[in-house]
Amino acid sequence: MKTIYSVGQVNRYVKNMFVQDFVLKKIYVKGEVSNCKYHPSGHIYFSLKDETGLLSCVMFAGHRRGLAFSMKDGDKVVVGGTVDVYERDGRYQLYAREIILEGAGALYERFLALK
């Protein structure tokens, strides 16, 4: 007989796989900021993108105190943190602990040139 799993069981299993991966525990990712939203709770929700992909990210209010600039769409940044699964939604994302500004992103500049 086939083993049938609940959605929650699958999400928990996938989360455990992420937790066990030592590369994802402390990773730095370079990209351009997109869809940057400052939540009333103090959290920052944003995406990192490049020519080949998109990665959902969040910086919780407690880590935001160390942010030395006001992040916005189009910023080219390096984000340090942990990639993990938000178990309820089954979505993986980068939980940012550190964000370093590198300047304006080329993708955003090309977008502005088209306007």
PLM regions with names:
Residues M1-K115:
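Acidic, two-metal ion nucleic-acid-processing modules in DNA metabolism proteins
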